[in-house]
């Protein structure tokens, strides 16, 4: 399944979460898109709930189904709780950490920065959004990209960097200090439902 590249507003409203991180999608119309949107929220089956939870998390991180399943399988090989490990691996993606550091307003914008070669890891250019960053690695902006307007605007509007990431706005670089705790990850996701979905 290819990654969805269309408008995120409809997906956000259908799933009941803000994929952009701004919350604007749900402010005016907190219901699914369509003529009968307000009446479309119906009780889902157990399978429907599991599928919806999977779609929420997959769209939140902007990952296609093949990548999503591969990360899920990798998480199952780790010690600890499968669902939590899964979310930690998603959070460890390079595009996500660029977003978390405030270098991009959305994960989609962060993915573009990585794809276009503007981002470095430990001083080396990395243009793979799915690159799995390890704790202790340093993420930065290439010298020739430091004056990009999109980065400046994003940093000006960002006022929060999670505790598991450090960021130096003057150097335009940050460190993935440690793996996040579950309490620091999206609370609107019930990852146990996703584990159940793939265990069917």
Swiss-Prot record:
GO terms for cellular component: small ribosomal subunit. GO terms for molecular function: rRNA binding; structural constituent of ribosome. One of the primary rRNA binding proteins, it binds directly to 16S rRNA where it nucleates assembly of the body of the 30S subunit. With S5 and S12 plays an important role in translational accuracy. Gene3D superfamilies: Ribosomal Protein S4 Delta 41, Chain A, domain 1 (1.10.1050.10), RNA-binding S4 domain (3.10.290.10). GO terms for biological process: ribosomal small subunit biogenesis; translation. It comes from Halalkalibacterium halodurans (strain ATCC BAA-125 / DSM 18197 / FERM 7344 / JCM 9153 / C-125) (Bacillus halodurans). It holds the Pfam family Ribosomal_S4. Part of the 30S ribosomal subunit. Contacts protein S5. The interaction surface between S4 and S5 is involved in control of translational fidelity. It comes from the Bacteria. The gene is rpsD. PROSITE patterns: RIBOSOMAL_S4, S4. Residues 22-41 are annotated as: Disordered. The keyword RNA-binding applies. This is Small ribosomal subunit protein uS4. Keywords: Ribonucleoprotein, Ribosomal protein, RNA-binding, rRNA-binding. Residues 92-152 form the S4 RNA-binding domain. NCBIfam families: PRK05327.1 (NF003717), rpsD_bact (TIGR01017). InterPro entries: Ribosomal_uS4, Ribosomal_uS4_bac-type, Ribosomal_uS4_CS, Ribosomal_uS4_N, S4_RNA-bd, S4_RNA-bd_sf. Belongs to the universal ribosomal protein uS4 family.
């Amino acid at each position: 399944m290819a990654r969805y590249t269309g408008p995120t507003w409809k997906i956000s409203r259908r799933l009941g979460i803000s994929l952009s991180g701004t919350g604007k999608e749900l402010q005016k119309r907190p219901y699914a898109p369509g003529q009968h949107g307000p009446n479309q929220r119906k009780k889902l089956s157990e399978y429907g709930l599991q599928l919806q939870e999977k779609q929420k998390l997959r769209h939140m991180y902007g990952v296609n189904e093949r990548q999503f399943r591969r990360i899920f399988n990798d998480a199952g090989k780790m010690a600890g709780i499968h669902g939590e490990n899964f979310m930690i691996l998603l959070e460890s993606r390079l595009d996500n950490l660029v977003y978390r550091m405030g270098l991009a307003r959305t994960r989609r914008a962060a993915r573009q920065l990585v794809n276009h070669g503007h981002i470095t890891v430990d001083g080396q250019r990395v243009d793979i959004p799915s690159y799995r960053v390890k704790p202790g690695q340093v993420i930065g902006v290439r010298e020739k990209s430091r004056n990009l307007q999109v980065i400046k605007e994003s940093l000006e509007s960002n006022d929060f960097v999670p505790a598991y990431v450090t960021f130096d706005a003057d150097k335009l670089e940050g460190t993935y200090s440690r793996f996040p705790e579950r309490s620091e990850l999206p609370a609107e996701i019930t990852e146990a439902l996703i584990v159940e979905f793939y265990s069917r």
